A protein has these predicted regions:
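An anionic, glycine-rich sequence signature occurring as long contiguous blocks
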Residues: 123, 137-169, 223-226, 230-366
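Conserved, well-structured functional cores that handle cations and Mg-NTP chemistry
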Residues: 2-198, 202-229, 236, 244-257
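Short amphipathic alpha-helical "interface-anchor" segments enriched in bulky aromatics
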Residues: 99, 103, 203, 252-254, ...
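Short, contiguous acidic/charged loop-to-helix segments that flank catalytic cores in large enzymes
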Residues: 389-394
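Generic structural signal of hydrophobic/aromatic residues within well-ordered alpha-helices
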Residues: 9, 13-20, 33-37, 64, ...
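Generic secondary-structure boundary/loop-capping signal
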Residues: 64-65, 111, 115, 119, ...
């Protein structure tokens, strides 16, 4: 591929930015936006305002800082432009919308939403801001289309912190899965096309999230915690007989068999009788799944690169029954992924009953594109260098 010179690169950037600039209401915003984006794209150790200004607008740090932190960006006008551009690039029935979290580590306590909470970047509790992220992806190309700040419940109820960070009264605590549903609805209303919603167990464990996707007619493949209870697909439900002759009728129906945790449904290490798939990772990400040539049991129980097995189940997410237990819900695919590290991951999918194991594994592993997007946003575009501390600074 021929190298693109600086003049051609800037012309391409100008063409890409043109519809976004048209959505900005102020002349000074239209002037500073291209310089800010150039600062993010150009090489540099830090992507905060001062070092970027030194590279793209020497001597004009205050002007660039005003654009980033004081000048209000009309996101409601910019988001449809981003959605349209993303759909043109990667949208379609074979695209996926990935729901995930990413965290920005922070030192102080005054930035909006900062609290000691789980930080995936560090793999532990840390002082950070949490963002709900939704990249649209097809193949190996992810395009971030939504990034929403999560306000922890305790933080959202602290009037002092809210006031200092400029959080308006109408912005209240919403769980991450509800923020994700808000963004999914917005993207669909803007005409962004995708065929499946993907997410990890933090979203997959929420029955209300799965049910909302069902009601919206959206197929999904989501992670699942190992203690999630499920029933076999042929389970039946009936009202039990009274405990004694002439006794009161029972209030709740009872399933024909008890539910079990998903971790008990697959052999560990993998059973040679189970059909497995290997996942071959290329330099640009996961490739398509292939039928494993050697069963895991023949290699000491270690699957080659990652092995998959699936079975039909009914999740215990139906109406509530006695003892705070839940009755069987809809029939779904339960997928067990055996990783080379020895870890097992469980996934639930609404794919149709005739879906192949290759199709299920391909959907699950498409979440890799979200990890790639987060890595690029932080390492190449300086997402974790952003210095805004209030909700108005966006």
């Amino acid at each position: 591929m021929a190298r693109v010179g600086p003049e051609a690169w800037l012309l391409r950037l100008d063409a890409w930015l043109a519809p976004f600039l048209a959505a900005l209401p102020r002349v000074e915003q239209r002037r500073w936006a291209p310089l800010y984006v150039q600062g993010l794209l150009l090489p540099g150790e830090r992507k905060s305002v001062e070092p970027m200004a030194a590279r793209v607008a020497p001597g004009q740090v205050q002007q660039l800082h005003h654009f980033v932190s004081t000048s209000t960006w009309p996101h409601e006008r910019l988001e449809p432009v981003l959605g349209g551009q993303a759909d043109r690039l990667v949208g379609g029935p074979d695209a996926v919308l990935v729901v995930d979290d990413t965290a920005l580590v922070r030192q102080g306590r005054h930035s909006v939403g900062v609290q000691r909470q789980h930080c995936g970047q560090l793999g532990k509790q840390a002082n950070c801001q949490a963002l709900v992220s939704l990249p649209l992806a097809r193949g190996e190309v992810p395009v971030p289309v939504a990034l929403r700040l999560f306000l922890p419940e305790r933080w959202a109820q602290d009037s002092g912190r809210r006031g200092r960070a400029g959080v308006p009264p109408e912005v209240t605590f919403r769980p991450k899965w509800q923020l994700a549903l808000d963004e999914i609805a917005r993207l669909r209303a803007q005409g962004v096309r995708f065929g499946c919603v993907l997410g990890d167990a933090e979203y997959g464990k929420v029955a209300a999230f799965r049910h909302a996707l069902d009601e919206a007619g959206l197929p999904w493949a989501l992670g699942l915690p190992p203690n999630q209870k499920v029933f076999p697909p042929d389970v039946t439900v009936a009202m039990p007989e009274p405990t004694r002759r002439g006794g009161r009728p029972r209030k709740h129906p009872v399933p024909s068999v008890p539910s079990v945790a998903v971790s008990f449904l697959f052999a560990d290490p993998p059973d040679a009788a189970l059909r497995t798939l290997s996942w071959r990772r290329g330099t640009n990400g996961p490739r398509r799944p292939e039928v494993a040539k050697v069963p895991p049991a023949a290699t000491g129980g270690k699957p080659p690169e990652g092995a998959f097995a699936a079975r039909r189940v009914r999740v215990a997410d139906g109406p509530e029954a006695a003892g705070a237990q839940h009755l069987p819900g809809e029939e779904r695919w339960l997928v067990c992924e055996h990783r080379t590290t020895g870890a097992r991951k469980f996934h639930l999918s609404s794919h149709p009953a005739e879906a192949s194991l290759e199709q299920l594994a391909a959907a699950i592993k498409a979440r890799w594109s979200c990890e790639q997007a987060h890595q690029q946003l932080k390492e190449e575009l300086g997402l974790d260098h952003y210095e805004g501390s209030s909700l108005d600074e966006r």
